[in-house]
Regions:
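Catalytic and substrate-binding regions of extracellular carbohydrate-active enzymes
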Residues: 1-88, 92-93, 101, 110
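Generic recognition of flexible, low-complexity loop/linker segments
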Residues: 7-12, 36-42, 52-54, 134, ...
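Long, repeat-rich segments with strong aromatic
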Residues: 18, 41, 158-168
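Hydrophobic residues positioned within well-ordered beta-strands of beta-sheet architectures
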Residues: 21, 51, 66, 145, ...
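Broad, structure-driven detector of short, well-ordered beta-strand segments within folded domains
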Residues: 39-42, 104-106, 112-130, 209-214, ...
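Trp/Gly-enriched beta-strand surface patches
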Residues: 86-148, 298-313
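A surface-exposed beta-strand-loop module
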Residues: 140-157, 321
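Non-catalytic terminal regions with compositionally biased, polar/charged low complexity
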Residues: 167-338
Length: 338
């Protein structure tokens, strides 16, 4: 059984509807220990935003791929084509490399859509391929529909981004792909995607999903913090927020963690926090505190004895301290004081 030396892997649940999953990868010593990556998945209703950073290895013989889908086509599924940028593809065998200078929209045989932004080398295929049966005792062959992002051989700090739309249609997929061509109509925005954090804004649910891969200190200037509050929570609650990397309300975390904050009615917010690191000591998960800092002054509308909400006397920020244990999510409702 393969075991990883990485402990930052797990998820967050938000209002029992949305969530986040993160996986920090380090290849096993018996396979390729040079392989590393950070993968995150942000789940909003039927939309999944998938991000990857820090993809690196020293394998100069094989290309590194991020699989979008790999569907075995039985007798009933074989006649079904995949849809590539609005055009059905039924041919067998078929393999196409898509233009990296364009965004692309794919639909697999099960009605799952994929939107891949520009700057990525995407391949799609429908062909016979060999594979091992589940007990790895013999080799089989079958017809598969596949799509993948090619990062090349021995990638160094490669990245990816794509959106998955569950149970969609060609018409709906085309409309959302067109909407993504403008930041004014995009259904999601990636505010940060680097070695420090993956942060995504979902327009429909008005939610911000955050994966902090490293600790983030409080900004040194009060003016920057005040500006974040005014732009994210405008004076009128009905106004839309100005969403940008400089306005995200979660401004500091003391260690890597997950957080999702959703705009509620009025000037309220629903905040979920989780630490996927189980903090295992002698084989048991041990509780430990985690402090997350928000711009502005907040009070808790859902008091919890294991949660402390404290407004800073020296800066317009609120420190929220929760007890994390066994990877569970801590959720609370906050109200903006001013």
């Amino acid at each position: 059984m393969l075991r990883s030396d990485q402990t930052f892997v797990g998820g967050l649940s938000h209002r029992k509807r949305n969530g986040i999953f993160v996986m920090r990868i380090h290849g096993a010593k018996h396979h390729n220990p040079s392989f590393r990556a950070e993968k995150t998945y942000f789940l909003f209703d039927n939309r999944i935003i998938c991000l990857g950073t820090g993809i690196v290895n020293d394998d100069t013989e094989h290309a590194t791929h991020t699989n979008l889908f790999q569907k075995h086509l039985g007798e009933q599924e074989a006649p079904q084509g995949i849809v590539v940028d609005g055009q059905a593809a039924h041919q067998v065998p078929m393999k196409r490399t898509l233009d990296p200078e364009r965004a692309h929209a794919l639909l697999d045989t099960q009605g799952t859509g994929y939107i891949i932004p520009t700057g990525q080398l995407v391949n799609v295929a429908r062909k016979n391929q060999k594979f091992r049966e589940q007990h790895d005792k013999k080799e089989l062959e079958g017809l598969f529909a596949t799509a993948w992002i090619d990062h090349g051989k021995a990638p160094s700090a490669a990245t990816y981004e794509y959106a998955v739309l569950v149970n969609t249609s060609p018409t709906r997929l085309a409309a959302l792909a067109e909407a993504m061509e403008s930041s004014d109509t995009a259904f999601y925005q990636v505010l940060q995607r680097d070695s420090v954090a993956h942060i995504v804004w979902d327009e429909d649910s008005r939610s911000l999903g955050c994966v902090f891969l490293e600790p983030v200190p409080i900004p040194p200037r009060k003016t920057e913090i005040t500006g974040r509050v005014r732009r994210w929570w405008p004076p009128k609650a009905t106004d839309s927020p100005l969403v940008s990397p400089l306005t995200q309300p979660i401004i500091a975390v003391e260690r890597p963690c997950l957080a999702m904050i959703q705009q509620g009615p009025g000037h309220s917010a629903i905040l979920s926090i989780a630490d996927p690191d189980l903090n295992m000591i002698d084989g048991l998960s041990q509780p430990r505190e985690l402090t997350v800092t928000l711009a502005g002054e907040w009070t808790s509308a859902s008091p919890n004895p294991s949660t402390r909400v404290r407004v800073d006397d020296n800066a317009p920020v609120t420190h929220i301290t929760v007890v994390c244990h066994q990877g569970r999510t801590v959720e609370m409702t906050l109200r903006k004081a001013r």
